[in-house]
């Protein structure tokens, strides 16, 4: 089920909120758990046993780790069970066939692919990381093991962040899970509705609209339509325009989903961590990763980079730790070599900055922003082949070897205003304007109502457009 659909906006969400608000205080987590399972099973009912197994493995392992507090060996055994359970499911569904295909291609073997796992369980990359963080935190004694399986299940499958994050650690919401009375206030609900509306507008008014530019240029994989230009017919400037449009679409799509999820979390009485902080205004790649998908980079920093030694064991070890983290970041995004290349690409950039470039970037004013945006856009080009079936080699040939073809002028005339608005919305300017408008209750309500009505009208009048990060 997608947030930006009629069935979610007009059926699931209102019914769920009504049941949740009307439920007795001690039954709210039960309502949340059951409604979240309905949300998950709506289009993925065959993966319901996978979700249940993941919940049970980590719930029971957490209890066992805490129970055997004085027996380190047993604690490690149950932590290992939890890690193997979560990572094993992720590997089986997401990476097993990729490993087999890669082995066949590289080694000349003839391993048969596993049948029946062509479809990836929605959100598995996100909720497995949540269960991993829970079990590790219990082992570290950072949190107490959750004794109520309904409360634990509600944490794992909470629908606002289930499919595409933000990645929420158990300690982020454990206190709120156990507040049965006065969990939410009217101001929280209002703030949540505001965030949800802005997120919906980002998705349908910006991401989908600017994504149409990219589709008009490159087309859609396996689509019978011939109305698009096609990569082979596009000029180099047009391909650059398309990649810029894709970069904007990816940001508004993912940050819009995160904002909707955070907003719904507030409506339910939970404070989820922020996931984006205007990443396209960054003046270095290092800063970009502090602003982009912050819950993922934070997860890898806390559970991989720091345990490996972080910055504490010399420069060589630091660079090696960075290599491992960026490689895993690429692998996390998808079972495809283009994602591995993308992760290694960022490792090289981050290592160069760490070794010598960062002090020079801090002295600059304009060129560091241009440098960062250029490299980030090139990085997003590595994602494209996975989404559209476009030839990776042809795309980069078009980007970096000037070639003729269809001019971008037609597309600039049709999408120019949208491009300008999109670029402005990548900066804090809109937030500053909103902070001024919200001081007056009339302008605040009118702005939210207008955005909600217009966004909903677009949802009603358009076809279903899934969020891009559902693929990861």
State the predicted function of each range:
Residues 1-471:
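Membrane-embedded transmembrane alpha-helical bundles that form the catalytic cores
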